[in-house]
């Protein structure tokens, strides 16, 4: 390639790198819904509570809010153990409340970022319940498994919340992998069907 063209292409690439993206010029605010603002007096924060504080956040100059996980969950890890990706935790409100919150944010030019947990799910998720019943079933390969014996787990490091990263399931006589707690089995991203289910969300 001609030298001048190389220089021009390099300058164009550098200019593109220097162009500011939307996240470069605004202030984002993380909201842990459970403790942010309670609208109905039950002691638990909710979407209506967030809505009631949007004018305040706008006055502070907040341009984006990052909402911690709000999907249905048994809450072993503050909502980071999702049992239903298509349902809202009732403590926080309804799907209509969530949609209203998003609409009210849009009116104020506040971007909404949702913390969607895709590394793992809850051990109460229907996929995992199915995976633990049948080694040959559809959902078994949605997770990471290793064979072994009950008294001799595969080699592995410590889980984030302590203990081994491998947990024994007697029904299938295998160990499943969990980076965090035993209630949060890791999803197997090598499985195409599992990936497509997540993409469909």
State the predicted function of each range.
Residues 2, 8, 17-199:
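Acidic/aromatic-lined carbohydrate-recognition and catalytic surfaces
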